[in-house]
From Swiss-Prot:
Disulfide bonds: none
Keywords: ATP-binding, Cytoplasm, Endoplasmic reticulum, Hydrolase, Nucleotide-binding, Transport
Primary location group: cytoplasm
Superkingdom as given in the UniProt entry: Eukaryota
Classification via CDD domains: ArsA
Keyword rRNA-binding carried by entry: no
Protein name: ATPase ASNA1 homolog
Role noted for this protein: ATPase required for the post-translational delivery of tail-anchored (TA) proteins to the endoplasmic reticulum. Recognizes and selectively binds the transmembrane domain of TA proteins in the cytosol. This complex then targets to the endoplasmic reticulum by membrane-bound receptors, where the tail-anchored protein is released for insertion. This process is regulated by ATP binding and hydrolysis. ATP binding drives the homodimer towards the closed dimer state, facilitating recognition of newly synthesized TA membrane proteins. ATP hydrolysis is required for insertion.
Species: Plasmodium chabaudi chabaudi
Single GO MF descriptor: ATP hydrolysis activity
Keyword Nucleotide-binding (UniProt): yes
Pfam families cross-referenced by the UniProt entry: ArsA_ATPase (PF02374)
Length: 380
């Protein structure tokens, strides 16, 4: 985290939906601004594995369904936890979520597929040489699949799409695909001009009537599509990213890395959801009557030793609770100092049970709209 302080200064109000709104009132500690923003088409939810991305994306989708005509929750995480979250099986086709008439879910695989990659022409010869030409662009196979996927998504008639993404590394790779496509397809287009004579000669010598112009028409189409996707990514009126983390070192570090990459790619990000936060048992930590104090009262009044033993066990639990609060407060303070002036930071409480099933997700989603102070430990 040594770069945290210097990197924080690079994050400006340009990350927010409304660059003219940089006052404290705008950065409320809830997601109301996100839900009420009817111009958004794509909302990406991402972060480190195991921090509650799926729960958060499902909750956001539920709230959006109350405001928008039609909502699609799209899982690009290979683990596909959305089915488990809703206790309902989803596939690669949009499926209506139980109890809703405008909220759909689908689970897709964004990894490389032999069935779709490089099939830009019916010619077997061309399909064999294109991969060779693109060997200098590692990951182009996945990028082409991603381009086809995003084109399909753009053709879907939903008011807004919520992306439940894979862990940070995979997500950053996915967001880099438009740049990779632009470079690779630009390379092929330039290659056409350099090798135009050779390609024409090959076409005249072969018997399978290769349609080189048709091939480059497809390449130009892919290039135009990739540019359009990139423009959509970088339009804060249409696309935004919600970062999800927990108040622990690795998660906060990955969140910082993710926000830096989003900033470099000019992708809007103005919301951070911090899950599994231990809140004080009362409005202030100092108001908690400690087990140590109770134990002193017991000793003063000569109550039986067996009851004293129970209080000692409770004291151990109290120590764990306070230690957890102190540890989380360290990272909550870092989050507040780094992003408090530019982001909606929403702290969600550690709950007693797993958030599975529509009712529990719906309850969690309501909490995303409720403002809560960042619970920094302060015993005095």
């Amino acid at each position: 985290m040594s770069k945290a302080g210097s990197d924080a200064s690079s994050i400006s109000c340009s990350l927010s939906l409304d660059s003219d709104s940089c006052d404290d009132e705008f950065y409320e500690t809830n997601l109301n601004k996100l839900i009420e923003n009817t111009s958004l088409n794509w909302i990406f939810v991402g972060g480190k594995g195991g921090v509650g991305k799926t729960t958060t994306s499902c909750s956001i989708a539920i709230q959006l369904a109350k405001k928008r005509e039609s909502v699609l929750l799209l899982s690009t995480d290979p683990a596909h936890n959305t089915s488990d979250a809703f206790n309902q099986k989803f596939t690669n086709k949009p499926t209506l979520i139980n109890s809703f008439d405008n909220l759909y879910c689908m689970e897709i695989d964004t990894t490389f597929s032999e069935d779709t990659a490089f099939k830009i022409n019916k010619s077997d010869f061309l399909n064999s040489i294109i991969p060779e030409l693109l060997q200098s662009f590692p990951g182009i196979d996945e990028a082409l699949c991603f381009a086809e996927l995003m084109q399909s998504i753009r053709n879907m008639k939903y008011s807004v799409i919520v992306f439940d993404t894979a862990p940070t590394g995979h997500t950053l790779r996915l967001l880099a695909f438009p740049d990779l496509l632009k470079k690779a397809l630009g390379y092929l287009i330039n290659l056409k001009e350099k090798l135009k004579g050779t390609l024409n000669m090959l076409q005249s010598l072969t018997s399978n009537e290769m349609e080189f112009e048709g091939m480059y028409d497809k390449i130009n189409h892919l290039n135009t599509m990739s540019i359009s996707i990139q423009e959509n990514f970088q339009n804060p009126l249409k696309t935004t990213f919600v970062c999800v983390c927990i108040p622990e070192f690795l998660s906060v570090y990955e969140t910082e890395r993710l926000i830096q990459e989003l900033t470099k790619k000019n992708i809007s990000c103005y919301n951070i959801v911090v899950n599994q936060v231990v809140f004080p048992l009362t409005s202030q930590d100092a108001n908690i009557e400690s087990c140590e104090g109770l134990l002193k009262q017991i000793k003063d009044t000569n109550i039986k030793d067996s009851f004293s033993s129970l209080i000692l066990k409770a004291k151990e639990l109290e120590d764990v609770y306070i230690s957890r609060r102190k540890l989380q407060s360290k990272y909550l303070t870092q989050i507040k100092n780094l992003y408090g002036n530019y982001f909606h930071i929403v702290c969600m409480p550690q709950l007693k049970s797993e958030i599975r099933g529509l009712d529990k997700i719906a309850s969690f989603s309501e909490m995303l709209l409720q403002s809560k102070d960042i619970p920094i430990y302060s015993p005095q």
